[in-house]
Amino acid sequence: MSLTHYSGLAAAVSMSLILTACGGQTPNSARFQPVFPGTVSRPVLSAQEAGRFTPQHYFAHGGEYAKPVADGWTPTPIDTSRVTAAYVVGPRAGVAGATHTSIQQAVNAALRQHPGQTRVYIKLLPGTYTGTVYVPEGAPPLTLFGAGDRPEQVVVSLALDSMMSPADYRARVNPHGQYQPADPAWYMYNACATKAGATINTTCSAVMWSQSNDFQLKNLTVVNALLDTVDSGTHQAVALRTDGDRVQLENVRLLSRQDTFFVNTSDRQNSYVTDHYSRAYIKDSYIEGDVDYVFGRATAVFDRVRFHTVSSRGSKEAYVFAPDSIPSVKYGFLVINSQLTGDNGYRGAQKAKLGRAWDQGAKQTGYLPGKTANGQLVIRDSTIDSSYDLANPWGAAATTDRPFKGNISPQRDLDDIHFNRLWEYNTQVLLHE
């Protein structure tokens, strides 16, 4: 689909209508706050409705959807100040305590030597580390943390494209035999290296990929270096993919263009699954991209995160979020105390979208109410700059192109399968800057 481009008059009329519906402020205001119930194109929660959309509710249950476990996960800050890491990665072995020069080597060693459930810490000295990092299912709780003063000082980087062939993937990811059959993450690499299709697809395009529970990242940057080296077409290029439960990111930067952060639920065979919870907490971080750059099926809370939409690749469309939550699951993505911004190509243009549902797996059937994924997302207590479409901030669904339809009925069911589940509450929208 393509974005709608209004003439100056039409844009003014649309803005006037949405402002009237959302609080009566005039277009000359510096900002406005959408208010309940909003419009069909921009639905807004009431204070009572918003009461259930908190981290406590999102993280209340783990385990299987059919048999949820009320474990009430409460993430605590990732404290590495007193950690003496047994594994230290640096540009030169033996310098500044570096035990390894490759993050994957350190991960492999940690998994072989610590098969239990005691948390293992891997310290990354300042530098740029070129290559993938794969953490397999069943790994012990693992924390990778940068030792620099800022996350920009520790960078994990590689250029991977969903459209590349398995042969090109093998040459890019494993040119010197970094992955071997006896390695813990060999099966992850091999599943992508031996794909039968012409391309590796999105599922194999991640620079860093963890299938394990209790995985943590702190104070580092992960970048898929494909960035603007490709055209504005379809080039999924995941920086970070997580599939496990109780994942935490703190003071992390994720950089790419299309599909930057894949916060997902899958099985060991790299297949999408619809039977269990995968929870993630992302705090004090920065995520950059252009199309669907935060997407997936996990239950994820983003707290004090800046989402920055960029125009440098020349994409005709821009979407921040693309959740594909199971329709029977009440909680998908929650964005709180955060900022949604754009670069100079978008700021003031009001043409990027906050997001769209991802009707994953429904290309042939179209959206089937109650069967197809129906992405769930709430943006609350956050600021949205002038990069984003004022009257129509949500796009038609990915995969099916299902038109966005918000529920503004006085007696609405927030999980009605005949409507989208993309909401706002207490957002501040900047009209110009």
UniProtKB/Swiss-Prot annotation:
A lipid is attached at residue 22 (S-diacylglycerol cysteine). Substrate binds at residues 202, 236, 356, 358. The keyword Flavoprotein does not apply. GO terms for molecular function: pectinesterase activity. The active site is at residues 259, 292. One of its GO terms (biological process) is pectin metabolic process. This is Pectinesterase B. It comes from Dickeya dadantii (strain 3937).
